[in-house]
Amino acid sequence: MNKSEKTKAKILKEAKKLFWNYGYSNVSVRQIAKTAKVDAALISRYYLSKLNLFKTTIGSFDWVHDFDINDDNIIDVYTGWLLESMDMKDETTVVKMLIMNSSDPVVGDLVKDINIKKMRKPILKKLKKVSPLQYDLMISAFIGISQTRKTLKMPTLTSLKKAQYEKILKHIFKGATTFKS
């Protein structure tokens, strides 16, 4: 990897952390440049614009292509994702990106559209017993508990041990995926 490729990769890495943790509109090009320890002009040179850089960070996530999700393991897969990110530090996960950017005035619609096209629709195609409503209820619980723990920092949730948190997640997700309308 030559110097310009390394610089471009460093910009992408730092932009992803900032965009996904703080939201697109809350992050400036100067802030990205400062964090990446590069001149701000290099962002325009390599990515043309802040928006293109953001789109590149989203494109760097593989969405559902690597996820073996089916009716029998969906609860375990989603529980595992939240258990992997139990610490309270900033994180670069797709959950955090969705939470921080789906209501953004500039990129919100883009993020929602990508989530539907690259996450929801492909996963629903893999499910036979879990209905679209049940899946959406589970996602609501998934994002809700993540927000409540990480953003609102509710003491009873932030102090949970991994085994307790896992039990709660499975209980909530089972309730969502077995809901009868």
Language-model regions, residue ranges each:
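Basic, helix-initiating cap at the start of DNA-binding domains
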Residues: 1-22, 26-37, 51-52
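Hydrophobic alpha-helical connector segments
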Residues: 63-95
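Short, solvent-exposed alpha-helical "recognition" segments
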Residues: 50-55, 63
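Short alpha-helical scaffolding segments that buttress acidic/His motifs in well-ordered protein cores
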Residues: 82, 94-102, 138-146
